[in-house]
């Protein structure tokens, strides 16, 4: 069944015996939160975010894959769920499933933190330096809100990001580069594979001896 939430097309399919929803979300933390609230209300229990991010660690290059271990909130949505929390974390179990699936699919990746902002044109040198010191390697506009909503609603969430540009003295955009588009598709296929394999493994473990 194909339908829409907040003007975003939603595809539902069965993967590994489970119903899976895929939605192409709009840009930004508030949009991500609205999408998640709807999906969770419809019964979603595990969220995998596949996104694109700018690299602030210039050792990363367009097309590189980063599995998030945390996200610093510099946006206005997550504070409506948890006041005073600076860094949000993904759920451990789906993050492990995600990393295992990427390895099985031969997709090289690293782990790192994201800096999530509402103001991409205010990514100043001072802010970039601050978040680099804090441990962030990429910047995006959604991940901290994704983790915040998931934690508040008691569902699991993990995130994998593809580097789409490099934020430095000389901005290096590569949003529509072949390597970025190809890697996004590869990663999405790996996520779907992981959801199928991970759920099958959970069912095997749940069976009585």
PLM regions with names:
Residues 40-41, 132, 151:
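Non-catalytic positions within long, well-ordered alpha-helices that form the structural scaffold/packing
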Residues 85-134:
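Active-site rim beta-loop-alpha module in soluble metabolic enzymes
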Residues 45-46, 137, 156:
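Short acidic/polar active-site loop segments enriched in Thr and Asp
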Residues 1-96:
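Metabolite-binding pocket within alpha/beta catalytic cores that recognizes anionic/polar moieties
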Residues 1-4, 106-113, 198-209:
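Flexible, glycine/charged-enriched surface loops at secondary-structure junctions
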Residues 167-209:
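His/Asp/Glu-rich mid-to-C-terminal helical/loop segments that flank catalytic regions of hydrolases
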Residues 144-179:
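Zn-dependent metallopeptidase/amidohydrolase metal-coordination segment
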């Amino acid at each position: 069944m194909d339908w829409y939430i907040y003007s975003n097309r939603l595809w539902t399919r069965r993967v590994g015996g489970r119903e899976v929803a895929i939605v192409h979300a709009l840009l930004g933390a508030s949009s991500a939160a609205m999408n998640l609230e709807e999906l969770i209300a419809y019964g979603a229990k595990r969220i995998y975010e596949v996104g694109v991010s700018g690299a602030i660690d210039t050792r990363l290059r367009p097309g590189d894959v980063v599995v998030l271990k945390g996200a610093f909130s510099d946006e206005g949505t997550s504070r409506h769920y948890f006041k005073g929390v600076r860094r949000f974390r993904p759920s451990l179990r789906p993050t492990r499933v995600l990393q295992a699936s990427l390895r099985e699919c031969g997709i090289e990746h690293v782990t790192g933190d994201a800096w999530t902002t509402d103001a991409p044109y205010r990514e100043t040198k001072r802010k970039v330096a601050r978040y680099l010191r804090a441990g962030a390697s990429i910047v995006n506009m959604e991940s901290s809100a994704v983790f915040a909503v998931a934690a508040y609603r008691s569902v699991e969430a993990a995130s994998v990001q593809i580097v789409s540009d490099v934020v430095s003295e000389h901005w290096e955009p590569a949003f529509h580069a072949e390597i970025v588009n190809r890697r996004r598709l590869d990663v999405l296929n790996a996520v779907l594979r992981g959801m199928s394999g991970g759920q099958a493994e959970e069912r095997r473990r749940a069976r009585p001896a």
